[in-house]
């Protein structure tokens, strides 16, 4: 089935149906204002009509309108609209499915025409259709047709008649006559722009072949609502939209065939059923002891009617339809008549629950449509489905019990009516009344708790008997008894379903973490499901066992997190000690084709409700590739693991379900000590990261203490970061002035404070690329995103020994077992094994030195000394080749070190360690695969590396121009604040070889408007470093390098023009990327014409900078533009032809620039007069937003659009 058509249609249909319902409600005088307040018009009776506001209706509509008003007041306008919109959407989808399958009794299409687009077949056959649907009105309907101008009214009557006719077979979907929703059936149904047209025209008929189309329609119908509520605390009425997901058919088959089908095959192993179930998994070969245990619990025979299957979160019924197929095959095998089977299955075998009325409607419909394929008379048999939407008990019990007159103590229509209430209360000691009271008490929050509500099994027989009596009263009782029975049946039926015990519980349960749960649900989870409270899916997983018979099967697809996360460790322990894993298809990400990305990672499994610790389950590792590959790999039994005993999982710390690990590897955890409490969690700022953390280049170097001496404001903090081993990711600093006084005022959690500033190791807690650990020198703090490891007093292990272990293949593989999700929590890392070895310690020290040298090559390190290319004289090409040689040596050295570490560990362990993704990745920027990824060719690697290296050289050159760096001194030279002390540095000779700019303002122009712009100074920098002799050669190498990746080559351009083009179009982008949107050179820009742009060094900015920018650059440039415009006008007077066209184009461009710059000058003068000062401690994000739209990319940096003046 191609779901693209449905995906496009259904969300729009929801909006269209909602709009249509709102429009109809408006005509009925029911509306809401913008704040959601109800506005109800008074009903004014005028003869045989009633007026609601401005609209007239027949008087007969009044009772139904009043019911709508009541619902609007009780539920709220929005809920009423949503409910009525999906009611009509569901009904019309159902009729569309039935007409295409020929299931409507009269045999004609209701919503379409087989031959004439936009027509309705029923209007061509009014006598026959009227006879079938509305025989008492046949004459009137035929007359309407003959009149020739009443097709709209006629069609409306026929459609409502069809709904009434379907009520008898599907009362859950089609209400009886006088349903108030009929008033909201949209108008203009026969027009070409009717609301019906999308349903008929937008979804091809072939997409309606399978009943699962109903499920897809529903999923996409609620998709926008789902997007709107995801990530928020979810109200009870929004739980369905937030938690429902349509399960792919192949996953459903796997679950049903290995639970319902397996139940049959255990007793009848030679059954032909096995050949019909392509996803059935044969058990692994078991030991004789396990085989004997299985034989002892396997029943000798099974009657098909006795097999009970429950989906406790049935949605639109996809799982139940597959259960129907398997059960049908079982009945057929036993020789039942084909036409008898559907009713037997629907009434005896299949049970479904959901909190969503819509979904339960569609689920019931799907089951009846399946049954209709096998029994053409099924819709007339009065089948009693066991699929219900859970309802909350909001009844007036005394009133209902009185009406029910269950024990026949009251005489209707006599003086007994005067004492009804007293009589009812006098009979409250009956078993049925007590049962009713305690049952209704369970369902006060049914729309929130759903199938998690626990009904005592001992009530099952009494509930069934009570239910049967209610069914009889609903048919045979007096008017009040029928009404009361009808009210009570849903509650007693849902309680009876939850009180039973099943052979198989099969589900795709709702997913919702604690953050999304409302207060009631969260409290319920804590009390009832302490081991699985972290997510709804886990609670359903655990609760399902209480709904099973002993030895029944729990089969679900849910999030894989329960297999690994420490928050589910108790749940795993309970499962391993009390249940038996049978089979699992570990699906990972992208198993649901409708969901992209890595967030939703799933696993499908079947677990038996008994315990056999020595059982060997069958696992399939299907975590790679897309849905189609996963499906095919399962069909072909690829990546199968079936040699691990269930008890083996308990040998791994935390008992993760790491089925792919070898036994030797699993046993290594028993032999080695764990890292333990050396691993500690870091601080958190209480949600104020933007207040307390900065990237280190943002602040003055005078207020930043890299050694943790304690007399500064800003200190380094380990905060995780990208995958990197050994050393690096030193990017952030934290305000820890006066022992963190401001943090403490903010109620920050300063965990493990005694470890601050100590030497240790740190890792990234949340990482999509694997586990790695870095050396953390003295002087650092660490937060919860970059938790840390420290050696204890008198520790036999050094931090270097630990780092060698943590960066080995062994730990990388261990991490994939213990926490193969995105999180490496402190609790998880404490479980990692460690190995003491002196050689490992020495190798780690060398690895740290190499990684540190690699990290410090770049100006984003605070230990950066100078650009490596300037270390070599001669020419830039030779410098680049030498630099590449230096990088290659670093890479080769680290390769050998890591290889030696892994060899030593493998020798100690006595087995080879499997390589996992990134476990052998050398995390140096010198390694082009690490730096750029594996997707590019070697030539692209080389070109990109050369281009990037030259871009870094230009950045360093700009730094020298600004005075941040100097050719005369290594490291940071000026990174203070407000230009203070700069003149003194210059006077000392700090910039003797290559003078820094006087004011820290560098014009960045696309043409040569200033002699000292950035381009001319880059040229001067190259001349200064490599000499005059090779200047042109060096400029050409630089230009050629930039055109390899940074910018595209341009014909006929000189080397300096290429460099200018890079600086004016790409340098700022590269700078933003290098400094992670916290630039230190700010780009002042006049706008899209680029009439004027300049860079200003953040650390040299002061309150006179804008005035100087204006007087030294902007005002003179305005004069030059005007002079050039005048010159071009003079030349145009004498030019003609192509020359005139060229001159005009040049002049017009200058006029645009002049106009833009004049406007910019006005704004610049306004801000210059304000003499704005900045405090570097506030950070770039705050300071960059103080200059309105004078700067480029304000929103990208600050998160807010610039203020206009």
From Swiss-Prot:
Biological process per Gene Ontology, one example term: defense response to virus
One protein family per Pfam: Eco57I
Catalytic activity field: a 2'-deoxyadenosine in DNA + S-adenosyl-L-methionine = an N(6)-methyl-2'-deoxyadenosine in DNA + S-adenosyl-L-homocysteine + H(+)
Induction section of the entry: Transcribed at slowly increasing levels as cells progress from lag to exponential to stationary phase.
One example GO MF annotation: site-specific DNA-methyltransferase (adenine-specific) activity
Keywords, comma-separated and alphabetical: Antiviral defense, Methyltransferase, S-adenosyl-L-methionine, Transferase
SUPFAM superfamilies named among the record's database cross-references: S-adenosyl-L-methionine-dependent methyltransferases
Activity-regulation annotation: (Microbial infection) Methyltransferase activity is inhibited by phage T7 protein OCR (AC P03775, gene 0.3). Viability of cells overexpressing OCR is unaffected.
Observed phenotype of the null mutant: No methylation of 5'-GGTAAG-3' in chromosomal DNA, BREX no longer confers phage resistance.
Enzyme Commission number(s) from the entry: 2.1.1.72
NCBIfam families: BREX_1_MTaseX
Protein family membership: Belongs to the methyltransferase superfamily. PglX adenine methyltransferase family.
General function of this protein: BREX systems (bacteriophage exclusion) provide immunity against bacteriophage. Part of a type 1 BREX system which protects against dsDNA phage. This system allows phage adsorption but prevents phage DNA replication, without degradation of the phage DNA. Methylation of bacterial DNA by this protein guides self/non-self discrimination. Methylates the adenine in the fifth position of the hexamer 5'-GGTAAG-3' in genomic DNA; methylates the same sequence in the few phage that escape the BREX system. Methylated phage are now resistant to BREX, showing immunity is provided by an epigenetic modification. Expression of this protein alone has no effect on phage infection, does not lead to methylated DNA and mildly inhibits growth.
Subunit structure: (Microbial infection) Interacts with phage T7 protein Ocr (AC P03775, gene 0.3) during an infection and when the protein is expressed from a plasmid; this interaction inhibits the enzymatic activity of PglX/BrxX through high-affinity binding. Forms a 2:2 tetrameric complex with phage T7 OCR.
Entry protein name: Adenine-specific methyltransferase BrxX
């Amino acid at each position: 089935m191609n779901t693209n058509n449905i995906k496009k249609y259904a969300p729009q249909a929801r909006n269209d149906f909602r709009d249509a319902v709102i429009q109809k409600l408006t005509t009925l005088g029911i509306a809401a204002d913008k704040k959601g307040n109800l506005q109800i018009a008074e009903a004014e009776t005028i003869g045989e009509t009633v007026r609601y506001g401005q609209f007239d209706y027949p008087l007969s509509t009044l009772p139904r309108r009043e019911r709508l008003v009541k619902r609007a007041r009780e539920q709220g306008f929005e809920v009423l609209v949503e409910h009525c919109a999906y009611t009509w959407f569901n009904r019309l989808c159902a009729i569309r499915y039935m007409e295409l399958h020929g299931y409507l009794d009269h045999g004609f299409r209701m919503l379409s025409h087989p031959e004439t687009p936009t027509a309705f077949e029923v209007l061509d056959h009014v006598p026959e259709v009227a006879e079938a649907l509305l025989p008492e009105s046949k004459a009137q309907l035929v007359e309407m047709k003959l009149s020739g101008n009443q097709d709209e009214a006629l069609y409306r009557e026929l459609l409502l008649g069809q709904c009434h006719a379907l009520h008898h077979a599907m009362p859950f979907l089609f209400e009886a006559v006088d349903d108030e929703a009929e008033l909201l059936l949209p108008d203009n149904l026969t027009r070409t722009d009717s609301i019906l047209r999308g349903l008929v025209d937008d979804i091809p008929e072939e997409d309606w072949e399978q009943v699962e189309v109903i499920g897809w329609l529903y999923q996409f119908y609620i998709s926008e609502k789902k997007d709107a509520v995801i990530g928020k605390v979810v109200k009870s009425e929004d739980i369905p939209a937030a938690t429902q997901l349509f399960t792919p058919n192949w996953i459903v088959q796997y679950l049903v065939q290995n639970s319902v089908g397996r139940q049959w095959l255990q007793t009848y192993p030679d059954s032909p059923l096995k050949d019909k179930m392509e996803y059935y998994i044969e058990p692994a070969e078991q030991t004789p002891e396990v085989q004997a245990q299985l034989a002892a619990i396997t029943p000798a025979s099974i009657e098909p009617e006795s097999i009970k299957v429950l989906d406790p979160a049935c949605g639109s019924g996809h799982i139940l339809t597959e259960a129907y197929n398997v059960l049908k095959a079982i009945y057929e095998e036993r020789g039942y008549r084909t036409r008898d089977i559907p009713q037997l299955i629907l009434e005896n075998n299949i049970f479904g629950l959901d909190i969503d009325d819509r979904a339960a409607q569609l689920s019931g419909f799907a089951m009846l449509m399946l049954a209709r394929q096998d029994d053409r008379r099924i819709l007339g048999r009065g089948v009693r489905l066991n699929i219900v939407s859970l309802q909350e008990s909001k009844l007036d019990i005394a009133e209902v019990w009185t009406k029910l007159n269950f024990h026949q103590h009251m005489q209707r229509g006599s003086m007994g009516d005067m004492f009804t209430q007293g009589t009812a209360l006098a009979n409250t000691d009956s078993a049925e009344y007590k049962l009713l009271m305690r049952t209704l008490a369970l369902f006060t929050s049914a729309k929130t708790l759903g199938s998690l509500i626990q009904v005592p099994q001992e009530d099952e027989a009494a509930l069934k008997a009570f239910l049967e009596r209610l069914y009889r009263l609903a048919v045979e009782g007096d008017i009040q008894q029928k009404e009361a029975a009808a009210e009570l049946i849903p509650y007693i039926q849902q309680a009876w379903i939850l009180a039973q015990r099943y052979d198989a519980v099969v589900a795709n349960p709702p997913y919702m973490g604690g953050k999304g749960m409302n207060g009631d649900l969260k409290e319920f989870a804590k009390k009832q499901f302490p081991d699985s409270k972290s997510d709804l899916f886990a609670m359903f997983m655990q609760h399902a066992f209480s709904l099973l018979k002993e030895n029944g099967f729990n089969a679900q697809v849910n999030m894989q997190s329960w297999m690994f996360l420490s928050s589910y460790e108790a749940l795993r322990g309970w499962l391993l000690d009390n249940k038996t894993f049978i089979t699992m298809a570990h699906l990972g990400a992208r198993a649901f084709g409708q969901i992209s990305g890595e967030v939703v990672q799933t696993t499908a499994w079947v677990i038996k409700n008994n315990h056999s610790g020595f059982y060997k389950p069958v696992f399939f590792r299907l975590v790679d590739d897309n849905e189609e590959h996963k499906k095919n790999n399962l069909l072909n039994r690829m990546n199968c693991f079936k040699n691990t005993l269930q008890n083996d999982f308990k040998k791994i710390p935390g008992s993760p379900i790491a089925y792919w690990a070898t036994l030797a590897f699993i046993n290594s955890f028993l032999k080695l000590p764990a890292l333990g409490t050396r691993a500690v969690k870091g601080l958190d700022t209480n949600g104020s990261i933007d207040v307390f953390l900065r990237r280190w280049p943002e602040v003055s170097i005078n207020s930043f203490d890299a050694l943790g001496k304690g007399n500064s404001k800003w200190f380094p903090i380990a905060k995780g970061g990208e995958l990197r081993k050994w050393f690096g990711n030193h990017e952030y600093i934290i305000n820890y002035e006066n022992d963190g006084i401001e943090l403490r005022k903010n109620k920050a959690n300063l965990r493990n404070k005694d470890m601050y500033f100590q030497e240790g190791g740190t890792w990234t807690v949340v990482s999509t690329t694997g586990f790695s650990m870095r050396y953390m020198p003295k002087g650092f703090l660490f937060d919860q995103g970059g938790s840390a490891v420290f050696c204890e007093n008198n520790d036999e292990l050094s931090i270097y020994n630990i780092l060698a272990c943590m960066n080995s293949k062994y730990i990388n593989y261990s991490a994939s077992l213990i926490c193969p999700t995105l999180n490496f929590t402190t609790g998880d890392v404490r479980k990692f094994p460690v190995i003491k070895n002196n050689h490992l310690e020495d190798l780690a020290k060398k690895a740290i030195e190499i990684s540190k040298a690699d990290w410090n090559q770049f100006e984003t390190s605070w230990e950066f000394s100078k650009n490596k290319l300037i270390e070599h004289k001669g020419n830039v090409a030779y410098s680049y080749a030498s630099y590449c040689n230096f990088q290659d040596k670093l890479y080769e050295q680290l390769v050998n070190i890591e290889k030696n570490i892994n060899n030593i560990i493998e020798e100690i362990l006595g087995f080879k360690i499997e390589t996992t993704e990134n476990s052998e990745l050398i995390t140096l920027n010198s390694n082009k695969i690490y730096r750029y990824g594996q997707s590019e060719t070697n030539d692209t690697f080389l070109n990109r590396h050369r281009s990037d290296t030259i871009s870094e050289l230009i950045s360093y050159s700009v730094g020298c121009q600004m005075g941040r760096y100097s050719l005369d001194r290594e490291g940071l030279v000026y990174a203070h604040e407000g230009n203070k002390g700069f003149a003194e540095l210059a006077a000392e000779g700090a910039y003797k070889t290559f003078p820094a700019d006087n004011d820290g303002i560098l014009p960045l122009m696309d043409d040569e408007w200033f002699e000292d712009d950035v381009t001319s100074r880059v040229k001067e920098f190259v001349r200064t470093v490599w000499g005059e002799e090779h200047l042109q050669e060096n400029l050409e190498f630089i230009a050629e390098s930039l055109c390899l990746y940074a910018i595209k080559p341009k014909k006929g351009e000189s080397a300096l023009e290429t460099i200018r083009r890079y600086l004016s179009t790409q340098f700022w982008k590269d700078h933003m990327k290098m400094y992670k949107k916290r630039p230190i050179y700010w780009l002042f820009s006049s706008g899209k014409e680029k009439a004027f742009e300049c860079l200003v060094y953040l650390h040299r900015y002061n309150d006179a900078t804008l005035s100087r920018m204006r007087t030294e650059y902007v005002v003179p440039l305005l004069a030059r533009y005007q002079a050039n415009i005048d010159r071009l006008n003079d030349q145009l007077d004498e030019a003609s032809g192509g020359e005139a066209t060229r001159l005009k184009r040049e002049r017009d461009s200058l006029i645009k620039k002049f106009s833009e710059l004049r406007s910019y000058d006005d704004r610049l003068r306004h801000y210059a007069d304000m003499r704005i000062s900045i405090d570097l401690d506030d950070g770039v994000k705050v300071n960059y937003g103080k200059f309105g739209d004078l700067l480029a990319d304000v929103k990208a940096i600050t998160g807010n659009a610039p203020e206009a003046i």
